[in-house]
Structure formats: C-alpha cells, structure tokens
C-alpha cells in the first residue's frame, strides 16, 4: 500500500509471509519503495537483534537526491536519476500512481551507451513533449542523435541547449497547461537541471507553491 506523505515521502505497508505487518515511513517516493518496505519486514522476522525503533529510524533518515524528488507541487517539477529502460519503467509507474492525469515535458539527455529507444517506449504514454538537451559531460550523446531516435519512436520533441535553457523552456510550457516538468535520462543532465532550478529559484518566485 502506498500513501503520499508530504512532497517526497510515503507510508508503506510492510508485510512478510510469517505473519508480520506494520507501516513504515520512507522519505522517498516511487513504486520501487515497496521493495524497501519488504526489506523492512524481512529484517523484523530475521534472527538479527535489531529493534523496531532502530529500523524505523534508519529508514526515516534515508536521503537520496533526484529519486523522484518533487521540487514543486504545482505545476509539478520533478528531478529523477532514471537513466536506463528498467528505471524508466519504474519512473512511469510512479508518475501513474501520483500524477495519473498529467503528462510531462521531459527534459532528456543520455549517455552514449544507453538504450534510448527502450527508455522512450517505457515513458511514451506520459510524455507531453520531449525537450532534448545535452549535459556538459564527455559521455553525453549529441542532441542530433537523440532527436533522430525520438523521431523514430514518434515522440514529440524539440532540441534546446544548454540545459539551463531546456529547463526554462519546460517551465514556460508548463506554466501554460499545468503539465509536469520532469528531468530524467541522464544523471548528468538532472544534476545540471537541479543546479539551474536552484539559481532560478533565488531570483524568482518559483518555489512559492512548493509543498
């Protein structure tokens, strides 16, 4: 069971086959947090001498930047470190859970060795428009190659660089229709988007409706 708690946390039912169940607060969002809750239950029924209080405290103190990190609730701005097909499937599931009626302006860049068609296939139902960009990193794939793959996947796109400009374009579009601004595909791109967001927030009211 998933329950949204604040901007970036959930409560999960932790259950185990040996008739143990409880509710654990995890300061992270995402369908994959069920696995963490299951690990909690497994710890409780193990032979390890670990108190319930210690386990709860340990999970509550977990911090992981860019793990479905909601920087603003409305219109949503989300930073995620998803960078392969499997993590994109998890990301789409999380979007479907918390924002079932919204699509995203996806600020996207990727490294040369990634399965980009697989990432597009996983996320396509949630993409309002792909905003292709490139991180300032030697492994970052050129925008033109990503655009070619987006065209083949029939994903609506535009190319905007540098990353700061890509964020500005996504925010501009989101302000018009309330769609999500989402950064994913490359940890390098997401790191630059987060830095740009922090700078913009200092000189504007971007965070006025942050949860």
PLM region descriptions:
Residues 135-137, 202-211:
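Short, flexible loop segments at boundaries between secondary-structure elements
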Residues 183:
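Acidic, glycine-rich flexible loop segments
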């Amino acid at each position: 069971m998933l329950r949204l708690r604040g901007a970036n946390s959930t409560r999960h039912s932790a259950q185990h086959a040996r008739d143990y169940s409880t509710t654990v607060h995890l300061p992270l969002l995402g369908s994959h947090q069920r696995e963490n809750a299951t690990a909690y239950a497994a710890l409780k029924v193990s032979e390890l001498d670990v108190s319930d209080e210690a386990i709860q405290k340990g999970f509550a103190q977990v911090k992981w930047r860019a793990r479905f990190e909601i920087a603003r609730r409305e219109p949503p701005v989300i930073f995620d470190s998803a960078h392969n097909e499997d993590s994109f499937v998890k990301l789409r599931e999380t979007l479907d859970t918390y924002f079932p009626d919204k699509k995203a302006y996806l600020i996207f860049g990727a490294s040369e060795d990634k399965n980009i068609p697989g990432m597009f296939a996983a996320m396509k139902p949630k993409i309002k428009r792909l905003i292709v960009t490139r991180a300032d990193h030697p492994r970052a794939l050129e925008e033109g190659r990503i655009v070619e793959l987006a065209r083949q996947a029939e994903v609506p796109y535009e190319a905007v660089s540098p990353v700061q400009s890509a964020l500005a374009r996504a925010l501009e579009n989101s302000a018009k229709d309330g769609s999500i601004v989402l950064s994913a595909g490359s940890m390098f791109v997401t790191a630059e988007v987060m830095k740009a967001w922090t700078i913009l927030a200092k000189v504007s009211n971007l965070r006025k409706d942050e949860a």
